[in-house]
């Protein structure tokens, strides 16, 4: 708390900007372009949420590892996610959103396969690291792409994407928990595998139109 106050004490809120949109509805219907971005973000949002809530339980139930090793699962997710988000901007500027997104999706694929089929706790930890890094920047890139669409005001497109993506983020833990209870926790993470493959085919939706 002290460090947060120290680093944020000089921050000032931005001036309120005029909003040209008159849409005050609680639900903003996504356009086809925004819906493509929603599909793209399904896998990173689901896997991020699943890893945060279920990675420790996965390690405990599958490998019966000590609490310290169990906790390392979520540490690996958070550490790689933070690192990728911190350094991603410069790589996006150099290589572009499409190439960075492809690398991210491939990283998620490697991570999910490792977690689903691993017979070693350390390989699973590496898998969680790949999931954290792979899921780090796709949603921020999708939000940026939604804001750059010219068919509607940026605020509407961003809200449309955010409301559905965060709904997935919030619903993922209980749904995956139900799957884990009835079919096994490996299967609950495996649900993300087809979604990762689908995300690969929607990377082109990040292009500005």
Task: Pin down the residues of each PLM region.
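Paired small-residue
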Residues: 111, 122-130
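A late C-terminal transmembrane helix in Major Facilitator Superfamily
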Residues: 150-185, 189
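C-terminal membrane-cytosol helix-exit motif in multi-pass small-molecule transporters
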Residues: 1-18, 202-207
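Structural signature of the two symmetry-related core transmembrane helices
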Residues: 99-114, 193
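Helix-to-loop junctions at the C-terminal end of transmembrane segments
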Residues: 84-97, 180-181
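Extracytoplasmic gate region of multi-pass secondary transporters
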Residues: 30-75, 79-83
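Juxtamembrane intracellular "pre-TM" segments in multi-pass secondary transporters
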Residues: 9-37
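Intracellular juxtamembrane helix-capping segments at the cytosolic ends
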Residues: 137-150
């Amino acid at each position: 708390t002290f460090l947060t106050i120290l680093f944020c004490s000089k921050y000032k809120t931005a001036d309120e900007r005029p909003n040209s949109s008159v849409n005050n509805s609680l639900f903003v219907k996504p356009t086809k372009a925004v819906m493509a971005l929603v599909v793209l973000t399904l896998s990173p949002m689901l896997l991020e949420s699943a890893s945060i809530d279920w990675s420790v339980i996965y390690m405990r139930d599958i490998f019966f590892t000590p609490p310290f090793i169990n906790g390392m699962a979520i540490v690996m997710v958070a550490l790689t996610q933070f690192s990728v988000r911190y350094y991603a901007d410069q790589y996006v500027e150099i290589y572009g959103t499409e190439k960075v997104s492809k690398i991210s999706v491939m990283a998620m694929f490697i991570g999910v396969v490792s977690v689903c089929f691993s017979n070693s706790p350390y390989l699973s930890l590496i898998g969680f690291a790949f999931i954290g890094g792979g899921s780090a920047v796709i949603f921020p890139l999708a939000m940026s792409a939604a804001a750059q669409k010219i068919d509607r005001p940026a605020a509407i497109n961003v809200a449309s994407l955010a409301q559905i993506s965060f709904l997935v983020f919030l619903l993922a833990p209980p749904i995956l928990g139900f799957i884990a209870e009835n079919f096994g926790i490996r299967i609950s993470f495996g649900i993300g595998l087809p979604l990762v493959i689908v995300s690969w085919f929607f990377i082109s939706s990040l292009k500005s139109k």
